[in-house]
């Protein structure tokens, strides 16, 4: 039976529950991963056939949903039947020869270990050592690897720095093109049961001399790429100038006059400023090369998408509807302490406004909530009464703490009122019946 996530719509549906907005980006990622999983399914029956894996570049500022996208994909890795792992580019170097840095190839140790976890979750450990090793290797070879801070390895700086970064990019290129890498030795201990004696014993399986092959792995690169929009806009402007020049040339810049002379050449007019579309502002291969990446490496990443900065409206929508929003997180924290937290719409708007002002995006929402509610949560520690906390927009603007309602006292008053009303009703009925 084909994996349901070979359907891109099913992947996007999962992303939609947590990552709000960014429709173009989510579609591109969902389609690429679905094709990757479909290729893995196809190779079970036709191992000789290979479809080129589409690697993806996600460009976007801090707090726009890039990391949240990874978290959602990570939750699905057992159903994907392949590891989904994120690594920070800055934690590694090309070969590990620079200032005792860790070589990038060591990421495959973690990939292989995670593949083993997935294998045992799905199939258990009843097979013999060779079968387990083969099964784990197949899962590892289909890994989806996300490399964060990808923009930080762009060629820049002094000669030594450029040399190191070029080495890094060359190493990465070899990985994407397809290469084999040795895995550090490790062991897996399993418990076996003797049916004759009903005794348990431990068996140690040595996983040694193992390799992973990156040919069928998928790579997703993430980065803010600060300033690349200027490169893209400059290119678009130059293209617009060229089109304007060509248009005017087609209308004969040197116009023939009735007297038989040529008039003065007309200057090429500056094109009017235009509002570029989302699709136009996706950096081209040439833009990324100009930013500082090797042409060969860029050519291996055919899918490029941009996560746009989140507006106040988008952040309010996230607070209200995302399953992992900062609002829901703080509601859980208060609930664990026996309290109820409510925010009015104006409060959510103020919180979103602060996050946008700081340039922190969705990532900054939790920080703003912490600043507003941490003291309240501390002061209420150990409180036995049932208290409702109301955070209002006008109180945030005025720098006031949230309102606290003693629900225990309110419940007591309501109960007493109910008893009184019931007693009065009973008395009236007795009088009317008599």
Where are these regions (language model features)?
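Conserved ASCE/P-loop NTPase catalytic core
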Residues: 2, 8-18, 27, 33-308, ...
């Amino acid at each position: 039976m084909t994996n349901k996530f070979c359907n891109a719509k099913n992947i996007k549906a999962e992303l939609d529950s947590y990552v709000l907005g960014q429709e173009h980006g989510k579609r591109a990622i969902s389609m690429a991963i679905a094709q990757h999983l479909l290729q893995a399914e196809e190779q079970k029956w036709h191992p000789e056939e290979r479809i080129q894996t589409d690697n993806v570049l996600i460009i976007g500022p801090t707090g726009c949903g890039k990391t949240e996208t990874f978290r959602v994909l990570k939750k699905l890795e057992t159903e994907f039947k392949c590891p989904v792992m994120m690594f920070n580019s800055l934690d590694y170097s090309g070969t590990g020869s620079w200032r005792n840095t860790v070589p990038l190839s060591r990421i495959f140790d973690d990939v292989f270990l995670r593949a083993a976890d997935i294998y045992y979750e799905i199939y258990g450990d009843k097979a013999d050592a060779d079968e387990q090793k083969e099964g784990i290797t197949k899962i590892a070879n289909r890994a989806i690897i996300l490399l964060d801070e990808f923009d930080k390895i762009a060629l820049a700086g002094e000669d030594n720095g450029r040399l190191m970064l070029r080495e890094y990019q060359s190493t990465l290129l070899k990985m994407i093109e397809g290469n084999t890498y040795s895995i550090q030795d490790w062991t897996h201990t399993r418990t076996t049961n003797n049916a004759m004696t009903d005794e348990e014993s431990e068996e140690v399986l040595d996983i040694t001399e193992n390799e992973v092959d990156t040919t069928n792995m998928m790579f997703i690169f993430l980065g803010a790429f600060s300033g690349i929009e200027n490169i893209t806009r400059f290119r678009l402007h130059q293209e617009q100038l060229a089109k304007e020049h060509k248009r005017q040339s087609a209308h004969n810049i040197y116009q023939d006059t009735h007297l038989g002379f040529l008039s003065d050449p007309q200057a090429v007019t500056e094109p009017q400023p235009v509002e570029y579309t989302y699709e136009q502002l996706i950096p081209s291969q040439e833009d990324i090369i100009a930013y500082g990446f090797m042409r060969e490496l860029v050519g291996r990443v055919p899918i490029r998408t941009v996560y746009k900065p989140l507006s106040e409206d988008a952040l309010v929508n996230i607070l209200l509807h995302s399953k992992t929003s900062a609002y829901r997180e703080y509601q859980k924290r208060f609930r664990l302490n026996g309290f109820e937290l409510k925010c009015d719409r104006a409060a959510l708007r103020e919180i979103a406004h602060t996050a946008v002002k700081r340039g922190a995006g969705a990532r900054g929402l939790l920080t703003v909530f912490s600043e507003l509610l941490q003291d309240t949560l501390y002061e209420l520690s150990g409180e036995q009464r049932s208290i409702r906390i109301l955070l209002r927009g006008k109180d945030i603007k005025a720098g006031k703490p949230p309102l606290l309602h003693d629900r225990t006292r309110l419940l007591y008053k309501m109960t007493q009122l109910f008893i009184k009303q019931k007693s009065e009703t009973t008395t009236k009925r007795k009088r009317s019946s008599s």
